Amino acid sequence: SNMKLTGYMKLIAEQSVNNRVRKSAIHAVVCHLERYTPNGILLRKVDKTYLLGFIDYLKKTKQEHCKKEKTLHVNTQFYYLKTLRYCLNRAVSEDYITVNPMNKIKNEDKPKRNRTERDYLTIKELTRLVHTPFYNTLLRKAFLFSCFCGLRHCDIIALRWEDIRYDENGNALLSIIQ
């Protein structure tokens, strides 16, 4: 098949209508693949060498949206590779390729996931935030919402009205797939 890797991944993203987090993760990986290989690569040409080069690219590339020249966090690199592996596994199951080239890469050559320490706001700090005026009310409300329900920034962005249901007592229930 003459399908490009990024074209195939975009198809998977479009099929992921019920999983907006996966859809946005795939789009993020596609953006990096397009920066790594501006002319693209055919899905059937993706091999161990290409993937090792992409891993090296992820280790060295700078975050686009960040003012500081920061490289991608190792957990972001790990997540991007996990997303790419998912797409390549789909390509195998749909007979676009016969084997997932990611399986040929040793674990020591892949980014390792770090356990991150999280600091949580105290009730006193949250109360202070609630009463602090901020010029962007929508952002303020979204941040406070994430504090009270424990959603990550990317989950808040992916959140849609159809993700909220109500039980028989009228309580709002949030349906998020991570």
Task: List where the protein language model places each region.
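Basic, Lys/Arg- and aromatic-enriched nucleic-acid-binding interface segment
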Residues: 71-74, 78-82, 93, 97, ...
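Intrinsic-disorder/low-complexity linker and hinge segments
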Residues: 1-3, 113-114
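Residues in well-ordered alpha-helical elements
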Residues: 6, 49, 124-127, 154, ...
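DNA-binding alpha-helical recognition surfaces that contact promoter or target DNA
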Residues: 25, 53, 79, 86, ...
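Hydrophobic/aromatic-lined pockets within catalytic cores
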Residues: 38, 59, 63, 89-96, ...
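Alpha-helical scaffold segments in carbohydrate-active enzymes
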Residues: 29-36, 57, 76-79, 83-93, ...
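Conserved tyrosine-mediated DNA breakage-rejoining catalytic core shared by Y-recombinases
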Residues: 104-107, 149, 158-178
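Basic/aromatic-enriched alpha-helical hairpins
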Residues: 2-68
